[in-house]
Amino acid sequence: NKIEHAGVHVHKSAHVNAPIIEEYPLTLECTVKSYDPATGILVGAIVAEQADEAILTDGVVDAAKLKPIVFDIATRTYRVVGDVVGHAWRDGLPLR
């Protein structure tokens, strides 16, 4: 059992047919709205969320505190999302 081997604790979601891993600082519970097997594109809807207070700033998830991990398929590695590289709705304004 991978869950037991990892040493994490789970409980059943009240909203979707999936386990909730209690040690995760952020959980987004989603339902599938559509899936295109030809492209692999999946569209989902978030139906519930749980966030640990430690990753929030003014009630909003703070990526710097969360330190999300992404999978890099090109190098088959996991990476931590890091530095700010731009500011939305501001940096592109001079290009108009």
Locations of regions flagged by a protein language model:
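Basic, polyanion-binding surface patches
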Residues: 1-96
